[in-house]
Amino acid sequence: MAKFIDEIKLTLIAGKGGDGIISFRREAHVDKGGPDGGDGGKGGNIYFVGDKGKNTLLSLYGNKQISAEDGINGGPKNLYGATGKSTYVKVPIGTMVFKNDKLVADIIEEKEYLVAQGGIGGRGNAKFKSNRNTAPRICENGTPGEKYLAHIVLKVMSDVGIIGKPSAGKSTLLSAISNAKAKIAEYEFTTLVPQLGLVKYHDHSFTVADLPGLIKGASEGKGLGIQFLRHIERCRVVVQIIDFGSEEKNPIEDFEIINKELEEYSKKLASKPKVVVANKSDLQGFKERVNIFKAKYPDVEIVEISAIERQNLEELKGKIWKILEEAKLLPADEEEETEENVEIKLEDDYKISNPYAGFFEITGPKIEQIYHKIPLVSYDNLIRFNTMLKKIGVWDDLLKYDIKPGDTVRILDYEFEWDGEF
């Protein structure tokens, strides 16, 4: 059996945009050839693609990172750099991608979802030609692609989730009402991964998941614990199956333990529509235990079945279908806020430090953005770099630090001597 992996962390690195270049036409018989430096190509994106044929994140297990190709640099003669090749990764339906605890993508369909945006290609000097500057020696580097540590979580998607204590009959019930061939045995924790099945009821159908058995303390991680409680969150209806046929079992205690675990894990989960199923009606003492339960919980409606003998299963399917139909009329659950991947945005801030006399260092997201965007390879680019720093207030702030001509200023790995002119 394939290993069930439903949570991993890895780094996503989209492609960097290609750099624009400085170039001028140099052709025989062409007098005063103008600028012809082309733009860099866009960096490749990373997409996750929903695949109903997958039910685990095993294919991503062991990967430290997923990357896309960088864009190609521009060329002379106004040649645009090629776009970097995007990367497409197939993942199970129900996969969620988080960045700094914010939801980036919720894969609920068989389609492509953008999870990391490629960088923008830098402009070549042909784009900077104007009436005032007919021979610009200005170009831009491509911007970095989006890079972050992704927290990837799989929550199995099904209409109905079957929950209960170990050996309550969950797998037997799934096999009896659906097309699933679940593993069944007379020992606890037979089900180690969620099992999915399709249930047909008259002209309708719905999906059911058999989830690993819950024990006291599951919400704190005991047994298979929190790892599988999260899968129930995706279900629209919860079927709680209880063993009413065994003398050593306590149906009331089992009912209360499961409800407490759901409540402690998530109030939203505990409030989902629920069908309580009394299993093993074929065994002696069943009816007596049902009556004791009803005396304690007269308002809890239960469906009496025997999963192994396939007794009263049509009534159960009808009850589930009715609740599913009623659930459609309820307000939709609030979705987690999704972070838009339109463009990498940086804050407009910077910091000036003066660790010792005659030395100043400028750091911050906005400074890095400008520095990486403008390659300091020509006088015109230096002028543009200087102008942008002046525009955001860096030079005025340096004067407040009483900077003097001859002092050293460092911006990342670029150092220059302050001459008092800007």
UniProtKB/Swiss-Prot annotation:
This is GTPase Obg. One of its GO terms (molecular function) is GTP binding. GO terms for biological process: ribosome biogenesis. Its cofactor is Mg(2+). Belongs to the TRAFAC class OBG-HflX-like GTPase superfamily. OBG GTPase family. The keyword Magnesium applies. It comes from the Bacteria. Transmembrane segments: none annotated. GTP binds at residues 164-171, 189-193, 210-213, 279-282, 306-308. Residues 2-157 form the Obg domain. It is found in: Cytoplasm. PANTHER family: DEVELOPMENTALLY REGULATED GTP-BINDING PROTEIN-RELATED (PTHR11702), MITOCHONDRIAL RIBOSOME-ASSOCIATED GTPASE 2 (PTHR11702:SF31). SUPFAM superfamilies: Obg GTP-binding protein C-terminal domain, Obg GTP-binding protein N-terminal domain, P-loop containing nucleoside triphosphate hydrolases. InterPro entries: G_OBG, GTP-bd, GTP-bd_Obg/CgtA, GTP-bd_prot_GTP1/OBG_C_sf, GTP1-OBG_CS, GTP1_OBG_dom, GTP1_OBG_dom_sf, OBG_GTPase. It is an enzyme of class 3 (hydrolase). Residues 334-420 form the OCT domain. Keywords: Cytoplasm, GTP-binding, Hydrolase, Magnesium, Metal-binding, Nucleotide-binding. Monomer. Mg(2+) binds at residues 171, 191. Its main location: cytoplasm. Its EC number is 3.6.5.-. An essential GTPase which binds GTP, GDP and possibly (p)ppGpp with moderate affinity, with high nucleotide exchange rates and a fairly low GTP hydrolysis rate. Plays a role in control of the cell cycle, stress response, ribosome biogenesis and in those bacteria that undergo differentiation, in morphogenesis control. GO terms for cellular component: cytoplasm. Residues 158-325 form the OBG-type G domain.
